[in-house]
């Protein structure tokens, strides 16, 4: 029985109860959200190391995903395992293995072993990889793709990205809608190239019922990928993007009827003035399915600092209702990220998600910020470290340049909070400034 099927029968599962406790909401709230398809809990029972269940969707905190995985040029399994550890250490709510080089099955197994949070994959990468090794990518059969999906389910993958909206009809819309950067989704591009070369329909769309059968068997959440997402501001919110979203909205309903959890992936390169519209359109067309976005990236020109640019867009999108942010790293658009890049990306997007939670009125986020302010006013450094999103970094910076006073080394005896208190109460909590 899937989480969705259990929720519809009125059953509160162990995972629902866990999510409710973590989020500070009632188990019934979570159950109702899952039953309605507005919350998903990626949870494949075969993922034995998964202990930190995550709820993604409306009424819950904004989540962050961290991508990792090998590439054609760089295959270092231990480094990818380290990336997974680093991502989880700094707060990634889920991780995705996007490996395209080396022994993909072995790499996935190693990452599953250390992934205490849900793990996602993009099965077409492995299906393409196998076909390319045998002959060429275009030789991939539909059966081979579904075989890979089945294998991922058996191994314990919790959610899979499937580019079901890249249909022949939507590719016609794309071809008739001039773009600056074409198709930028790797999985979507692979599927589109395969379809155009062979003149065949997307098997994930044509055989969607088969996909649902596999997903239901392993309770794999379907992450319906946006293969036609815009890859530049010039292409944002165009006809191809919306045409694909309309198709995805229909498939969300089919997934729900089949008892399969589904969330929807979104852009991408979107200017700030279009972020709200993109979130609202997605929620409207998909029956408020959880929205999992890449960024959003509000400028095309931040190469080397896309994690910062993406966090800006992600915070705004989260405020408007996006449910999970896929991080960007400093290496985005430039190369395969290192563990340090992963750390920087997760930190930037956890801050963005937290900012969105505050704006959405999340009670726990608001309380944490209030307590931080109180500790700051008291010059309670241990209290501040405990409440900081990243305590170790806060402590390191404080101790790196200490002060002779109780304040920090920026103001020292000129700390305004201390000075005002000194006047109001007739004494200071530390030394008054001297010449």
Swiss-Prot record:
TM spans (from-to): none
One Gene Ontology term of the molecular function aspect: carbon-carbon lyase activity
UniProt pathway annotation: Cofactor biosynthesis; thiamine diphosphate biosynthesis
Cited InterPro entries: ThiC, ThiC/Bza_core_dom, ThiC/BzaA/B
Domain of life: Bacteria
Binding site for substrate: 67, 96, 125, 163, 185-187, 226-229, 265, 292
Entry's Gene Ontology BP terms: thiamine biosynthetic process; thiamine diphosphate biosynthetic process
Pfam families in the record: ThiC_Rad_SAM
Residues engaged in binding [4Fe-4S] cluster: 408, 411, 415
Entry EC no(s): 4.1.99.17
Named cofactor requirement(s): [4Fe-4S] cluster
Keywords: 4Fe-4S, Iron, Iron-sulfur, Lyase, Metal-binding, S-adenosyl-L-methionine, Thiamine biosynthesis, Zinc
Cofactor annotation comment: Binds 1 [4Fe-4S] cluster per subunit. The cluster is coordinated with 3 cysteines and an exchangeable S-adenosyl-L-methionine.
Function: Catalyzes the synthesis of the hydroxymethylpyrimidine phosphate (HMP-P) moiety of thiamine from aminoimidazole ribotide (AIR) in a radical S-adenosyl-L-methionine (SAM)-dependent reaction.
Family per similarity comment: Belongs to the ThiC family.
Protein name from the UniProt record: Phosphomethylpyrimidine synthase
Record organism: Thermus thermophilus (strain ATCC BAA-163 / DSM 7039 / HB27)
Gene that encodes it: thiC
């Amino acid at each position: 029985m899937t989480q969705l099927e259990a929720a519809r029968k009125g059953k509160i599962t162990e995972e629902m109860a866990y999510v409710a406790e973590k989020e500070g909401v009632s188990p019934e709230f979570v159950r109702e959200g899952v039953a309605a398809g507005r919350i998903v809990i990626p949870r494949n029972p075969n993922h034995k190391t998964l202990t930190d269940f995550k709820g993604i969707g409306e009424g819950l905190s904004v989540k962050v995903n961290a991508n990792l995985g090998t590439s054609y040029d760089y295959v270092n399994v231990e480094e990818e395992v380290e990336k997974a550890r680093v991502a989880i250490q700094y707060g990634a709510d889920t991780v995705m293995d996007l490996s395209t080089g080396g022994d993909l099955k072995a790499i996935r197994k190693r990452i599953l072993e250390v992934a205490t949070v849900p793990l996602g994959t993009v099965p077409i990468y492995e299906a393409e990889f196998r076909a390319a090794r045998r002959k060429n990518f275009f030789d991939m059969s539909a059966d081979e793709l579904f075989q890979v999906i089945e294998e991922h389910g058996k191994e314990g993958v919790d959610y899979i990205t499937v580019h079901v909206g890249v249909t022949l009809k939507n590719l016609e819309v794309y071809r008739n809608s001039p773009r600056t950067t074409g198709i930028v989704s790797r999985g979507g591009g692979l599927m589109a190239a395969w379809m155009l070369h062979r003149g065949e329909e997307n098997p994930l769309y044509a055989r969607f019922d088969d996909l649902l059968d596999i997903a239901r068997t392993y309770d794999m959440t379907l992450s319906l990928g946006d293969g036609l997402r815009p890859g530049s501001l010039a292409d944002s919110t165009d006809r191809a993007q919306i045409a694909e979203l309309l198709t995805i909205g229909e498939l969300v309903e089919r997934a729900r009827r089949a008892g399969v959890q589904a969330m929807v992936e979104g852009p991408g390169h979107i200017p700030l003035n279009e972020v709200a519209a993109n979130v609202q359109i997605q929620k409207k067309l998909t029956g408020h399915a959880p929205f999992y976005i890449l960024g959003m990236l509000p400028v095309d020109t931040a190469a080397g600092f896309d994690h910062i640019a993406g966090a800006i867009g992600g915070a705004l999108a989260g405020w408007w209702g996006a449910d999970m942010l896929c991080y960007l790293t400093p290496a985005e658009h430039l190369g395969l990220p290192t563990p340090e890049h992963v750390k920087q990306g997760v930190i930037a997007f956890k801050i963005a998600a937290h900012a969105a939670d505050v704006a959405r009125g999340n009670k726990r986020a608001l309380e944490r910020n209030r307590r931080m302010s109180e500790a700051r006013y008291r010059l309670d450094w241990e209290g501040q470290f405990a409440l900081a999103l990243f305590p170790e970094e806060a402590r390191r910076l404080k101790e790196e340049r200490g002060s002779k006073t109780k304040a920090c080394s920026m103001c020292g005896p000129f700390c305004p909070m201390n000075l005002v208190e000194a006047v109001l109460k007739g004494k200071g909590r530390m030394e008054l400034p001297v010449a």
